[in-house]
Amino acid sequence: MGAGCVKVTKYFLFLFNLLFFILGAVILGFGVWILADKSSFISVLQTSSSSLQVGAYVFIGVGAITMLMGFLGCIGAVNEVRCLLGLYFVFLLLILIAQVTVEVLFYFNANKLKQEMGNTVMDIIQNYSVNASSSREEAWDYVQAQVKCCGWVSPSNWTRNPVLKNSTKTTYPCSCEKTKEEDNQLIVKKGFCESDNSTASENSPEDWPVHPEGCMEKAQAWLQENFGILLGVCAGVAVIELLGLFLSICLCRYIHSEDYSKVPKY
């Protein structure tokens, strides 16, 4: 390998590791977001889905190690440190294997996540209290208000709640209440509301002034959109990792041959 080719390889490897470092930060940030988000469907899933939490911690670990390896790769490439490049290659290969494993698990557990979300939402609805004081009740109120939906499949899911089931007045979940289209300010109401102009003798969902759509389809679209973005980022990182592996091998072989040529021969 000529000196000019080696120089190009060094700086290409440096550039790839810089991108690698940035994408590692994105993966780490995604894992932190899964754990910290309290205002979307993720916050509802966290209460029951251990697989989602495990996946989040894996993303944080992989992202942190990826950033470290990107840093080591930059130093090893610029200074031609063979031991650093070898260490970089080994860890990069392990990261790639772990990353592919997590992606496969997320892909094949998509239906399980959807089922877990449905079970969690129905449990929240059935046990929803008048004060709505728990974190998961507050999270579901936020979801219904933000996405403009009510219940899981439909608003009638709320009839399983004892408070609404036993009410003789037109009582409904406040976070489901319809808002004016021109009102862009998000106001999240909690608990149950009573209709002022109620004339019905029983509490029927048909009489509720709420959004008619359930949240299931919107939740599925949300999951597909966000996990699609995640898989796209991970695929981009995987391509950079493969290029990094190839370039690190080339540079390691060159450094080894250069060191060997400097050994005096008798």
From Swiss-Prot:
Processing after translation: Palmitoylated. Palmitoylation contributes to oligomerization and surface expression.
NADP keyword on record: no
Positions in the Extracellular compartment: 33-53, 111-227
InterPro entries registered for this protein in UniProt: Tetraspanin/Peripherin (IPR018499), Tetraspanin_animals (IPR000301), Tetraspanin_CS (IPR018503), Tetraspanin_EC2_sf (IPR008952)
Any one GO cellular component localisation term in the record: plasma membrane
Membrane topology: Multi-pass membrane protein
Keywords assigned: Cell membrane, Glycoprotein, Lipoprotein, Membrane, Palmitate, Transmembrane, Transmembrane helix
UniProt keyword Membrane present: yes
Listed Pfam families: Tetraspanin
Membrane spanning residue stretches: 12-32, 54-72, 84-110, 228-249
Cellular localisation: Cell membrane
Lipidation (S-palmitoyl cysteine): C5, C74
Stretches of the chain found on the membrane's Cytoplasmic side: 1-11, 73-83, 250-266
Matches recorded under PROSITE patterns: TM4_1
Glycosylation sites: N127, N131, N157, N166, N197
Subunit-structure text: Forms homooligomers. Interacts directly with IGSF8. Interacts with EGFR. Interacts with VEGFA and PDGFA. Interacts with ITGA4. Interacts with ITGA6; this interaction reduces ITGA6 cell surface expression. Interacts with ITGB1. Interacts with TLR4; this interaction inhibits TLR4-mediated signaling pathway. Interacts with TLR9. Interacts with PLAUR.
Function (record text): Structural component of specialized membrane microdomains known as tetraspanin-enriched microdomains (TERMs), which act as platforms for receptor clustering and signaling. Participates thereby in diverse biological functions such as cell signal transduction, adhesion, migration and protein trafficking. Acts as a attenuator of EGF signaling, facilitating ligand-induced endocytosis of the receptor and its subsequent desensitization. Mechanistically, modulates ligand-induced ubiquitination and trafficking of EGFR via E3 ligase CBL phosphorylation by PKC.
Family: Belongs to the tetraspanin (TM4SF) family.
Name listed for the protein in its UniProt record: CD82 antigen
Organism of origin: Rattus norvegicus (Rat)
Gene that produces this protein: Cd82
